Amino acid sequence: MAMAAAAAVASQGLVAASTQQQKKTSAKLSCNAAPVFSGKSFLRVKSGSNGAVRVRNVGVRCEAQAIERESVKADTGSGREEDAFSGLKQVCAVLGTQWGDEGKGKLVDILAQRFDVVARCQGGANAGHTIYNDKGEKFALHLVPSGILNEKTTCVVGNGVVIHLPGFFKEIDNLESKGVNTSGRLLVSDRAHLLFNLHQEVDGLREAELAGQMIGTTKRGIGPCYASKAIRNGIRVGDLRHLDTFREKLDILFRDAAARFKGFEYSAAAVDAEMEMYVKYAERLEHYIVDTVDYVNTAYAEGKRILIEGGQATMLDIDFGTYPFVTSSNPSVGGICTGLGMAPNRLGDIVGVAKAYTTRVGSGPYPTELFGEEGEELRKAGFEWGTTTGRPRRCGWLDIVALNFACTINGFTAINLTKLDVLSGLPEVKLGVAYRTQSGEKLRSFPADLSILEQVEVEYETLEAWKEDITKVRSYAELPVAAQKYVERIEELIGLPCQYIGVGPGRDALIVKQ
């Protein structure tokens, strides 16, 4: 597709771009006869005068028209029909661009129907994904990949994930109680690290130590578990197959925590109780455990399609986020390679998910944050309370500076703009397009220095708002003109297409714009 060729971008330092993709062009292209998926109704995209898009240096004009079909098909112009998402490469990743909670799970759930394998590569139960099935039932997943609702998909929890088994089994029990069969469809890496209750306790003690400088952790034990991994006294899933040495390793973890934190008391009885619990877990987990590095790479060699579901988001990345107010893993593109054992040159499409505005849970700098009634109005409209913690999310305008930074790091090929419907009815909408220092100097990129970030003045563009309810819209052309201009201005500022546009929580509330 002309659009796909224009949008393809190499992952910086990871995926080598082809010479063709790197060439600059000013040619104007037309999107012709490409139906796209939107749940119950489908779209046929054709050339027209509506919806100008700038992709790198390529101008594209498209008009979407709704059609009805029994399945998602596309007219290729050669008499053959193909699925609207068939242009996606063998390996596709869906990553967050902001501070999490962008709605990645919904796109993964939709795309999972077209992929053989859905894999998670990093993070733990701090990644809350909310998805809905065809009956409208809500599922809040934290460890299990969102593709689990598609019965033909195999879900993989990779080596880069930290796993709290009590929570993991609770998710499985909840899924199966609602008729979702996980047997033989859910695989756990033998290299993944186990997250124990003591990690969660230590997480809370660490936050208490920081007092007024708290990071705002979810207290799910993610950081302490990755710390155990880094100092090499962590316990891996594969260790459950060697229970004769498991207690000794567990004892070391308990003693280490007691030595570090005054509030943590070591006792042999506590170690024994944990050991007794994990003997039971070992038996139940056994049929889930595999060498996922071998499984994923074998699946790739066999031509199977692999979808990678990112947890958290780029601005929470331990290397690129607002450190130290970040997570303890790499939710950016590099985490895919280290968290699954997949070579960089095998990565294909990388879709960045961004809310039409910005939210953040917990502490840390947030330049476009809205306070008072404005922030509360946006929070209520978007139901912005954390999936994992239930904490109210901080809300603000879309931060283009941060979004461009995420695009640079990850080499996204397209953007999934979510929750556009939340902006309906607001008196005005704004985009934070630049940062300026106190002296008025415009910053070239997102700063690492938090003292600078906390003092920047955001330069905004104010755009015309729209009053119409767009939750039933399934065609880009049917969006209010003001909403289209908002989308197109974002595309101009980041140089990428907003190919997927979310207009509501349900599976069908998606416009695919080609």
From Swiss-Prot:
The active site is at residues 101, 129. It is found in: Plastid, Chloroplast. Its cofactor is Mg(2+). GTP binds at residues 100-106, 128-130, 393, 419-421, 502-504. Residues 1-73 form a transit peptide. InterPro entries: Adenylosuccin_syn_GTP-bd, Adenylosuccin_syn_Lys_AS, Adenylosuccinate_synth_dom1, Adenylosuccinate_synth_dom2, Adenylosuccinate_synth_dom3, Adenylosuccinate_synthetase, P-loop_NTPase. Mg(2+) binds at residues 101, 128. Pfam families: Adenylsucc_synt. Its main location: plastid. One of its GO terms (molecular function) is adenylosuccinate synthase activity. PROSITE patterns: ADENYLOSUCCIN_SYN_1, ADENYLOSUCCIN_SYN_2. It catalyses: IMP + L-aspartate + GTP = N(6)-(1,2-dicarboxyethyl)-AMP + GDP + phosphate + 2 H(+). Keywords: Chloroplast, GTP-binding, Ligase, Magnesium, Metal-binding, Nucleotide-binding, Plastid, Purine biosynthesis, Transit peptide. Binds 1 Mg(2+) ion per subunit. Homodimer. This is Adenylosuccinate synthetase 1, chloroplastic. It comes from Physcomitrium patens. The gene is PURA1.
